[in-house]
């Protein structure tokens, strides 16, 4: 496998908490319907949203583009295996670009500590 892209993003969880006190618009913009359902029931919604935000930003950085260049936050979805290990699903324009670039697998690491959430994504081709 060849590494086709590497992206990392870090975000201050407090920034997300402030946004959520005003409105849930950021959550609706960043999260897919599946993720939003989990967010609505989550014990720590700001932490959940911050980790998803960082993961999606890391994914677009790994692809070498940014949100808004035909790519939406909705094009990347973060899931977890029963073990807790995260994995990504790609849709729409993001999936098309992966196919065009022969990207067939992704790896993600997400972590959070008191004030910050961070994610790193690696995209690979055969």
Swiss-Prot record:
Give binding positions for Mg(2+).
Answer: 9, 57
This protein's record includes keyword Transport: no
Biological process terms from the Gene Ontology for this record are: fatty acid biosynthetic process
Catalytic reaction equation(s): apo-[ACP] + CoA = holo-[ACP] + adenosine 3',5'-bisphosphate + H(+)
Q: Which Gene3D superfamilies match?
A: 4'-phosphopantetheinyl transferase domain (3.90.470.20)
List, separated by semicolons, the cofactors it needs: Mg(2+)
The subcellular localization recorded is: Cytoplasm
Q: Which GO terms describe its molecular function?
A: holo-[acyl-carrier-protein] synthase activity; magnesium ion binding
Show the GO cellular component annotation of the record. cytoplasm
Protein keywords: Cytoplasm, Fatty acid biosynthesis, Fatty acid metabolism, Lipid biosynthesis, Lipid metabolism, Magnesium, Metal-binding, Transferase
The Enzyme Commission number assigned here is 2.7.8.7
The free-text function statement in the UniProt record for this protein reads: Transfers the 4'-phosphopantetheine moiety from coenzyme A to a Ser of acyl-carrier-protein.
The identity of this protein, by name, is: Holo-[acyl-carrier-protein] synthase
UniProt organism field: Pseudoalteromonas atlantica (strain T6c / ATCC BAA-1087)
- Source gene? acpS
């Amino acid at each position: 496998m060849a590494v086709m892209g590497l992206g990392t993003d870090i975000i201050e969880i407090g920034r997300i908490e402030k946004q959520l006190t005003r409105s849930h618009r950021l959550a609706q913009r960043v999260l897919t319907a599946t993720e939003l359902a989990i967010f609505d029931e989550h014990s720590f919604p700001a932490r959940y949203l911050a980790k998803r935000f960082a993961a999606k930003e890391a994914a677009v950085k790994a692809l070498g583009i940014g949100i808004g260049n035909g790519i939406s936050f909705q094009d990347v979805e973060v899931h977890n295996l029963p073990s807790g290990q995260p994995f990504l699903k790609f849709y729409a324009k993001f999936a098309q670009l992966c196919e065009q670039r022969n990207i067939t697998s992704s790896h993600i690491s997400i972590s959070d500590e008191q004030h910050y959430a961070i994610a790193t994504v690696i995209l690979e081709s055969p």
